[in-house]
From Swiss-Prot:
Pfam families: Ribosomal_L18p (PF00861)
Assembly behavior: Part of the 50S ribosomal subunit; part of the 5S rRNA/L5/L18/L25 subcomplex. Contacts the 5S and 23S rRNAs.
GO cellular component: cytosolic large ribosomal subunit
Keywords assigned by UniProt, alphabetized: Ribonucleoprotein, Ribosomal protein, RNA-binding, rRNA-binding
Biological process annotations from GO: translation
Disulfide topology: none
InterPro entries: Ribosomal_uL18_bac-type (IPR004389), Ribosomal_uL18_bac/euk (IPR005484)
Originating gene: rplR
UniProt xrefs under HAMAP family: Ribosomal_uL18_B
UniProt source species: Coxiella burnetii (strain RSA 493 / Nine Mile phase I)
Protein name: Large ribosomal subunit protein uL18
Domain of life: Bacteria
Amino acid sequence: MDKQEKRIRRARRTRAKIKELGAVRLCVHRSLNHIYAQLISPRDSKVLVCASTLEKEVRSQIKHGGNIQAATAIGKLIAQRAKKAGVTKVAFDRSGYKYHGRVRALAEAVREGGIEF
């Protein structure tokens, strides 16, 4: 089993537990150059809010999308959009990634934005 298969297996386990809770899920995906965040509804699995470093407004603020500063910017943006959508509490789905670096920076920025985990 390689590194990616292990990550996907961890992600499946986490998603199953979050599904039992029935909470809105904050799903994070990271690549080498970008980071993506989505709020997904528990019932019909539809995306309520999304933000990524590919968006024009974010690209103008940051130089490179694959670092901690970019993750912090995305965390703040997703928190603002979540509040507009009426979401105040979420379950954090880190997609099998370690809670470290960019994933941690995004999560902390979302918490600072007023969203509860």
